[in-house]
Amino acid sequence: MNTTGTELNGELVLGRPFVRISLLTLLAGAVAALAGALAAAQPKLILGAAVSAAVLVLAFRAPVTNLALLILLTAVVPFEILNRFSVGGGVDSPGLLFSDLFLLAGLVWAAFALASQPLDRRRYRSVFAMVVFLMIVVLEVLHGLRLGYGRSIVGQEGRVLLGLGTFLIAMPLVSHSRSRERLFAALALIAFALGAWGMVQWLGHFSFGLAGDVGVRSGVRLTSGGSGQLQGGAFAFPVAIIVCFAALTLGEIRSWVWRGLLVAALALNIASCLVTFERSFWLDTLAGLLFVLLFAAGRRRVKLLLILLGAGVFTVAALAIITPSTLTTAQQRLISISSYSSDTSVRYRVVESGFVYDRIRAHPLTGSGLGASIFWGQPWAQVPPKTRHYSHDGYFWLAWKVGVPAAALLIGLLVSALFTRSPATEDPLSRAVRRGAQGAIAGLLVATITFPSFSQLSIAPVIGLLLALALAPQLGRRRRSRPSVSALAAA
C-alpha cells in the first residue's frame, strides 16, 4: 500500500518538503502576527498564544496524544477546573479552555490528514455529514449572537456541539494500525482514571460543583435513605463499561497487565455508574451491553454473560462492604421505575418538553439559535417561572437549538454507525472495540431521551470518538494475525 501523505506512526506526513516548509512558514507568520496584536492589546494573552502554538505543534507531531488529552480533559476533569485556567474566563463567563485548544488544533491537523488519505464512499459520506453539521453549528452561533442571546451561553453550547468534531480528528487515527493501538492504550488508561475519579468523589464525599459535573448531589429521590447521587463523569461511565466489557470479552487480549487494567476500569466504572442512582444511565448501560451480546457468537454469548455476571457480583459485593446502604438505595431507585405515573420528574420532563416543542414548531428549519431559552415554572411544586436554556430530552434540545434538519443529520449519522460491518481482515481487538463503540452509541441514544447528551461537554467529544471507532475501516496492514495488547505498552 502506498502510504505517502497519510498518517503513520502517529504523525502526519505531508509528502513533499516544499509543502511542509510552506505550511510552517505560513503558520509561523500567522502566530507572529497574532502575538504582536495581543502584545499591543493585552500582554497577558501572550502566554495563551504561546500555549496555543505549543498545542498546535503537539497536534501535528503527536495527534494521538492530542486526542487523548482532549478526551481526558472533557470526560474526567471538572469544568470548574478547566474554566479556572482558561483565557479570559470566570465563574459565570467561560473563556478559552485548554480543551478548546486541543480540539481546534486537532481539527486543523484533521483537515490535512483527511485530505491526504483515500476516502471510501462510507467514510466520505460520514465526514461530509459531520463537516456540514459543524458548519451549521457555527451558523447557529452567529444566529444566537445576532438575536442578542447571552454570549456565555452561546459560546458554551457552541463549544459542546463543536466537540462532536472529535470524529474528524479520530477518523484518520483509528484507520491505521500503529496509531489505533496507541489510542486504544490511552483510552484504557482514561477509562481507569474515569472510574477511579468517580470512586474518589463518592468515597470522599465531594461537594456538588457549581457546574453540576463534579461531586455528589445530596439526596436521592424516591428512596428512604439515599445520601446522594454521584455527578462527576456520569455520562461517560456507561461508555467506559460497555467498551471495556467488549474489549475484555471479544478482544483476545493476551497481556495480563492490560487485562488487569481493563478489569479494574470495568469494576470502578460499574461501581461509579451504580452510585449515580440515575435510572437512565443504568438503562443506557444495559442497552449497550445487550447490543454487544446480541452480535456475539452463540457459545461466546454464554461466556460474555458469565463474565458480566461475575463483574457485577464482585462490584456489588465490594460496595456492600464499603457502603452497606448503597444497595438498599439502588434497589429502591430501581423499583421506582414502576411508579412513573406518580413520579414528579416524569411530569417535569413532559411539561418541559411541551415548551421546547412549541419553540421547535416556531422555527423547525433554522432552529431558535444557540443560547435560546424558554420561560416556565412548576406550579404543582411551587417553583416560580424562570428562564431556562436546558431541556432534559436531548433530541428536543438539539432540534430546538439547530433545527430539525441538522438534528436529523447528526442522529442519522449516529444510527448509521450501529449497522457498520467489520472488515474481514480486522483484528479481534479492533473488532471488539468497534462493537463496544456501537453498543455505547446505542446506549447513549437511549439515555438521550431523558438526558441531553448533546448539550454536555463531558460526553460530546466522546460521542465523536465513538463514531470514528464505529465507522472507520482499517487502512493499515496487519503485522500479525492475532495482535497482542502488550504491543500497546509503547504508547
What spans do the regions from the language model cover?
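Interfacial loop-to-transmembrane-helix boundary motif in multi-pass membrane proteins
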Residues: 66-69, 119-136, 158, 169-199
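Transmembrane alpha-helices of multi-pass inner-membrane enzymes
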Residues: 32, 244-247, 285-290, 413-416, ...
